[in-house]
Every structure is written in structure tokens, then in C-alpha cells.
């Protein structure tokens, strides 16, 4: 005689990604993939609010990243001229297509299957909306902000701690390279908190919705995104170190030397040896500084900037080369080249001129970093 199936107490599941029971209803069409960060927003009120806060116009083209089963998509289609849904999971792509199949909304929907981060660029659009897969939160923002013509508005759902970083202030523990970039290129507003119970399956963390409005036209800073971000990567590599220490790391010096030589070559400019005649700029050049040379011990509990886990390839290559040299021979103090001496003197000049030498990245706002970048440019030092 077959055994009677036992039900778990209070219909509890052993985990958020367990397979659904056969009789669980038509909405459980497949198992959600946690590798894709699939947490479907099931609260219609929040879906309405996300679309409402985008202030869509009938002429707008909307890009939605990760449409899932289409709960937000349908609402955007009702208001906009077109929605381009970018979906990594083919099953979800088929589901959102089926959602509007046979309706007038179908001709307004375009589905692109693929990873939005690996696309050459985000399709041109007026608005960007997303219940963002948390693992692509930072790359998605940087990709949007670096667009030549970014959307008018983006309404995005993020993990709560990540959202707090977007609106952090100088001195806050969550203040980061991400914070400075977003607030330099856009205005960011917190919209609402979203609890775990509003998703299926529920994530392990709470979420927040934010609205990002990039500066457009003449309001957009006349600075290359990669250039500003390159400076921030150096400053926030260790955000609790002084900027003087950050720019004394040997990998940073090597990068600045390389870029300075390229700049002089491209513009047919001779090396600026005049800075070497100023004793105040060359007094400490005999000290071979590196990441551990900063004597201020204000660590605040973090060693590396938590947002900058993707160290630039150039830094990695330099570190690997240095490690190979150390393994091959006993370290020795080689005499510095003239370019190296010039670049160190120029860095000292910039930090002294701007008055930022002894400030830490976590204490500086976007205007401080802009002042720093422009001063470096005056000395022929670039970061991209």
C-alpha cells in the first residue's frame, strides 16, 4: 500500500529555491534560477510605483533589464511607445513575450536575449527600468552613466545596502567610488523601501527603489567618464588613506608615468623638467613609497574599497611583473628615471596646489575630485 505524502508544517519549504510542488498552481511554470538573481516582483502596487516614478511619455522608448515574467513590462508598455526588454534567461524571454501575445501591446515589445553588461552598449532609450539582478547592480549603473546619451531617467530596484551607497554623503561608512560617480553624472533620489515578502522567491536581503536622473546636454560635465572614473579608482583603492599616500603607490606612479609619456608623445610636448628645480616638490623623492608606506593609521576597519573589486588590468599586469622580478632576484633600489622624477614632482605639485594632499577619499565630494582631475590635466597627467 503506497504511503501517504506528508506535508511540511505550515507549508514551509527547506529553502527559497526549492522545486515547486506539482499542484502549486499555474504561476509556478519553472524553477527560478538563483544564478541569474531571479526574484520576481509579485506586488502589483510596487510595479505600478516603479513605472509611475519614471514619468513615462507616450513617445518614450524604455529599456527594461531583467523583465522576468513581465509584471513591470506590461505596465510600461501601456504608457510608452516601445519597451526593449533585455533578458538573460531564454525561458523568461519566452514568458514575457507570451504575456502580451495576441494583444495590441505585442507590437510595442522587443526582447533581446543576452547579458546587458556584455552588450556593446545599452540601446538608446528615454528611460531605463529594472528589478535589477543584484550581481550586476554596479556594472549596470556604470554602463548607463558612460553612455554618450544616457536616458532621461532610470528607476531601479537594488539591494538596500547598495541603494544606500548611492545616496551616501562624504564621511559616511558607505561612501564610495560608486557614490561619487553617480552624484557627479546624475541626481539620485530614494523612492521607497521594498520588503523581502514582495518577491518570489524571497531574497535574503531587503530592497530599495531609487530614481537616477543623468545630467543631459549642457548640464552634463564636459569630462570623459573613463577619465573621471580612472581618478576615482586610484583615490578609492584605499579610501581611508590620504590622497598623498594613494598617489604614492608604485603601481599608481607607474600608470601616471606611462600616461604622461604617451600624452607628451601624442602632443609633441617635451618633458617638463622645470618642476625638478623646485625643492619643495622633490624633497621626498628618495623615499620609495608603496601601498604600506602611509603612516596614518586611520583604517576605519576596511583595507580595500569594497566597490572596487575589479582592479584595472594595467594594475594587475604591473603587480604580476613586480612579483616576477622579486622572485628572480633580491630586491634592490634602482635609480629612478627622469620621467619618474618629473611625474612624482607633478603629483606633489597638484596635491599641494589643490590642498587635498592630506584629505582622504571618503572625505572628498565630487567637486574636490573634479578640481583634482583638472589640476592633473594641467600637468599633462591623465587616467584613461
Curated annotation (Swiss-Prot):
Annotated region (Disordered), positions in chain: 1-24, 289-309
List of residues binding S-adenosyl-L-methionine: 39, 41, 66, 87, 115, 131
CDD domains: AdoMet_MTases
Catalysis performed (reactions): adenosine(1779)/adenosine(1780) in 18S rRNA + 4 S-adenosyl-L-methionine = N(6)-dimethyladenosine(1779)/N(6)-dimethyladenosine(1780) in 18S rRNA + 4 S-adenosyl-L-homocysteine + 4 H(+)
UniProt GO molecular function: 18S rRNA (adenine(1779)-N(6)/adenine(1780)-N(6))-dimethyltransferase activity; RNA binding
InterPro entries, A to Z: KsgA/Erm (IPR001737), rRNA_Ade_Mease_Trfase_CS (IPR020596), rRNA_Ade_methylase_Trfase_N (IPR020598), rRNA_adenine_dimethylase (IPR011530), SAM-dependent_MTases_sf (IPR029063)
The UniProt record lists the keyword NAD: no
Group of enzyme by EC: transferase
EC number: 2.1.1.183
Superkingdom, taxonomy of origin: Eukaryota
Subcellular location: Cytoplasm; Nucleus, Nucleolus
Record PROSITE patterns: RRNA_A_DIMETH, SAM_RNA_A_N6_MT
Known function: Specifically dimethylates two adjacent adenosines in the loop of a conserved hairpin near the 3'-end of 18S rRNA in the 40S particle.
Family, as annotated: Belongs to the class I-like SAM-binding methyltransferase superfamily. rRNA adenine N(6)-methyltransferase family.
Official protein name in the record: Dimethyladenosine transferase
Amino acid at each position: 500500500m503506497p504511503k501517504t505524502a506528508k506535508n511540511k508544517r505550515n507549508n514551509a519549504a527547506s529553502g527559497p529555491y526549492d522545486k515547486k510542488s506539482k499542484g502549486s498552481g499555474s504561476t509556478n511554470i519553472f524553477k527560478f534560477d538563483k544564478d541569474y538573481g531571479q526574484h520576481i516582483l509579485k506586488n502589483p502596487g510596487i510595479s505600478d510605483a516603479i513605472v509611475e516614478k519614471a514619468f513615462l511619455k507616450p513617445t518614450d522608448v524604455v529599456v527594461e533589464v531583467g523583465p522576468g515574467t513581465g509584471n513591470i513590462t506590461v505596465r510600461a508598455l501601456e504608457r510608452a511607445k516601445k519597451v526593449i526588454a533585455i533578458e538573460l534567461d531564454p525561458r523568461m524571454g519566452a514568458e514575457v513575450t507570451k504575456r502580451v501575445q495576441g494583444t495590441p501591446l505585442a507590437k510595442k515589445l522587443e526582447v533581446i536575449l543576452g547579458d546587458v553588461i556584455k552588450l556593446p552598449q545599452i540601446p538608446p532609450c528615454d528611460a531605463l527600468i529594472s528589478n535589477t539582478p543584484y550581481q550586476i547592480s554596479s556594472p549596470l549603473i556604470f554602463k548607463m552613466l558612460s553612455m554618450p546619451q544616457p536616458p532621461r531617467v532610470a528607476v531601479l530596484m537594488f539591494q538596500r545596502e547598495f541603494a544606500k551607497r548611492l545616496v551616501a554623503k562624504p564621511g559616511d561608512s558607505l561612501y564610495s567610488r560608486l557614490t561619487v560617480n553617480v552624484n557627479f553624472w546624475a541626481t539620485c533620489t530614494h523612492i521607497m523601501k521594498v520588503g523581502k515578502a514582495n518577491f518570489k522567491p524571497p531574497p535574503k536581503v531587503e530592497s530599495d527603489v531609487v530614481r537616477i536622473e543623468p545630467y543631459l546636454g549642457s548640464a552634463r560635465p564636459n569630462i570623459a567618464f573613463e577619465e573621471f572614473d580612472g581618478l576615482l579608482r586610484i583615490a578609492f583603492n584605499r579610501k581611508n588613506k590620504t590622497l598623498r599616500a594613494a598617489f604614492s603607490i608604485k603601481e599608481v606612479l607607474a600608470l601616471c608615468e606611462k600616461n604622461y609619456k604617451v600624452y607628451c608623445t601624442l602632443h609633441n610636448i617635451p618633458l617638463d623638467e622645470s618642476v625638478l628645480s623646485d625643492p619643495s616638490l622633490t624633497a621626498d623623492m628618495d623615499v620609495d613609497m608603496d601601498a604600506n608606506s602611509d603612516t596614518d593609521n586611520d583604517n576605519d576597519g576596511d583595507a580595500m574599497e569594497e566597490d572596487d573589486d575589479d582592479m584595472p588590468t594595467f594594475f594587475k599586469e604591473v603587480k604580476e611583473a613586480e612579483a616576477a622580478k622579486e622572485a628572480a632576484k633580491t630586491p634592490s633600489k634602482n635609480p629612478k628615471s627622469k620621467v619618474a622624477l618629473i611625474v612624482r614632482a607633478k603629483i606633489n605639485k597638484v596635491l599641494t596646489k589643490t590642498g587635498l594632499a592630506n584629505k582622504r577619499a571618503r572625505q572628498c565630494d565630487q567637486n574636490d575630485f573634479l578640481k583634482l582631475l583638472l589640476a592633473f590635466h594641467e600637468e599633462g597627467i591623465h587616467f584613461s
